[in-house]
């Protein structure tokens, strides 16, 4: 079925002007044009628009979304699962913040005095700071002071919501890999997840070349801090991830015909 731009706008809630913009930047091109030059969108185009809107909601820029959707390893089902997990974590945090506001209002109205820790439920930056420090340590170990400083400069610009999105996506990728360990490191879905992991690093932290990615896999089994952290997602995951990274890099360097 084909849809005119006005119909797509009505179905999706995205303005006609925005749809025109997405076409102009080649983020969402209509699959066909009428003889008069009017845009016609297919069901597949609508599915791509859905992905665009989900990625926007969790904080990605349009250029980043285009790069992900156009990536040969893009997996729509896996992306939807990751997006759901990220949005669930955001919902959980928002629910905690709403509860904190409600308890604070009761306290203001003369109810019980709130525990000081409860004042900040849903607002803590502790997990975010620990995640940021982990990446700083990882980069410093792999590439030295200069690149580490550049990475820290880049990540220091992230807001609390940025970091929560990054952490949720990171967590989702690890869980995705851990859930399929029994299929072996060369499993197609495992390899797609490893590709998503590398993309995640490139997007948020540093340019993860294949050589760097291989080195990262080695760090995961030689540094107990990283080994222990990764293995929380599944026994032996660190070593498994290293093997999966090696296979991924080999395939990238010597693509199968």
From Swiss-Prot:
Domain HTH merR-type: 2-71
Residue span of region Essential for dimerization: 76-104
Keyword flag Nucleus: no
GO biological process: regulation of DNA-templated transcription
The keyword Transcription appears for this protein: yes
DNA-binding region in chain numbering: 5-24
Name the UniProt record assigns to this protein: HTH-type transcriptional activator mta
Species of origin: Bacillus subtilis (strain 168)
């Amino acid at each position: 079925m084909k849809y005119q731009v006005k119909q797509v706008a009505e179905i999706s809630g995205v303005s006609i002007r925005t749809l025109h913009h997405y076409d102009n930047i080649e983020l969402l091109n209509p699959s066909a044009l009428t003889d008069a030059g009017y845009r016609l969108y297919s069901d597949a185009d609508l599915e791509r628009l859905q992905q665009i809107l989900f990625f926007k909601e969790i904080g990605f820029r349009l250029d980043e979304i285009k790069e992900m959707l156009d990536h040969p390893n893009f997996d729509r089902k896996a992306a939807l699962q990751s997006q759901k997990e990220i949005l669930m974590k955001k919902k959980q945090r928002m629910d905690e913040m709403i509860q904190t506001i409600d308890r604070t209002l009761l306290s203001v109205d003369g109810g019980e005095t709130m525990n000081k820790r409860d004042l900040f439920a849903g607002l803590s930056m502790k997990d975010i700071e620990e995640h940021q420090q982990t990446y700083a340590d990882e980069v410093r170990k792999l590439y030295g002071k200069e690149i580490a400083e550049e990475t820290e400069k880049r990540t220091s610009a992230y807001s609390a919501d940025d970091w929560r999105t990054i952490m949720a996506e990171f967590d989702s990728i690890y869980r995705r890999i851990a859930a399929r360990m029994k299929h072996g490191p060369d499993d197609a879905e495992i390899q797609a997840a490893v590709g998503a992991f590398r993309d995640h690093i490139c997007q948020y932290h540093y340019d993860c070349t294949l050589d760097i990615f291989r080195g990262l896999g080695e760090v995961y089994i030689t540094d107990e801090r990283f080994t222990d952290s990764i293995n929380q997602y599944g026994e032996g995951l660190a070593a498994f991830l290293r093997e999966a990274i090696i296979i991924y890099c080999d395939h990238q360097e010597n693509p199968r015909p």
